[in-house]
Amino acid sequence: MRLPVLGKDTVRMRDPEGLQDKITRIQRGGQEKLQIISDFDMTLSRFSRNGERCPTCYNIIDNSNIISDEGRKKLKCLFDIYYPLEIDPKKSIEEKYPLMVEWWSKAHDLFYEQRIQKDRLAQVVKEPQATLRDGYDLFFNNLYQREIPLFIFSAGIGDVLEEIIRQAGVFHPNTKVVSNYMDFDDNGILTGFKGDLIHTYNKNSSVLKDTEYFKEISHRTNILLLGDTLGDLTMADGVSTVENIIKIGFLNDKVEELTEQFLQSYDIVLLRDETLDVVNGILQFVTAKN
């Protein structure tokens, strides 16, 4: 029996029968064996609303009044140069990798110049009304109530990401975030970023220093992986034993050019779908017996 939610017109599947088999096996394993690994920007957060692009964690800072007009122009220039390269279907991940390092590094350098103040971040997040996808409350609350761990692996800004979820009222103890976190001095002024740089195409075990997380939940061998780029496909690399994994890709941009490429790697591809309906539908089904 196919789940009704998989009949949405935004849904594309590489192998519908194989997918249904995976869903059934995950359901049989029960919620005690399940974990969720997800990207944040444009995966848990919306790509657009009413035809307007929604901001990423970086965009929220870029467009805020804590950045000078000159700084904003420079950051917009970086976006205009590097974003088309990030999603270029003709470039390989190997070609994109150094370009993403350049982009993130240049953006971070511009942030340092702005002397960003820690105590202004909460207000900055409120201003653009950064939006989580429709159905976010059911998603976060259902996982929390069923004690299913949610691992958010983001190339965005951890401080901003956490504030968005917190202000939405769904930041629960079952949520673990690995991202680029700001480092502030004793006066609350940005001096750098902590740890290794995380960008779109190195979201794998190479930057996962805190492997204790996956050791603690090593019995959770069934995974739902949520992403919006081909770089997100490696987010489960830190999991030592995987029995079943369902990869769900949100394809937001260059849909016609990238659909086939996404279908080669993701089990489910969602075309311009601003909801978490499919994810929630699968979660409700696989946890129904529990």
Curated annotation (Swiss-Prot):
Entry EC number(s): 3.1.3.91, 3.1.3.5
Role according to the record: Specifically hydrolyzes 7-methylguanosine monophosphate (m(7)GMP) to 7-methylguanosine and inorganic phosphate. The specific activity for m(7)GMP may protect cells against undesired salvage of m(7)GMP and its incorporation into nucleic acids. Also has weak activity for CMP. UMP and purine nucleotides are poor substrates.
Binding residue positions for Mg(2+): D39, D41, D228
Subunit structure as annotated in this protein's UniProt entry: Monomer.
One Gene Ontology MF term: nucleotide binding
Name listed for the protein in its UniProt record: 7-methylguanosine phosphate-specific 5'-nucleotidase B
Gene source species: Xenopus laevis
GO aspect biological process, one term: nucleotide metabolic process
Positions in coiled-coil regions: none
Residues bound to CMP: E86
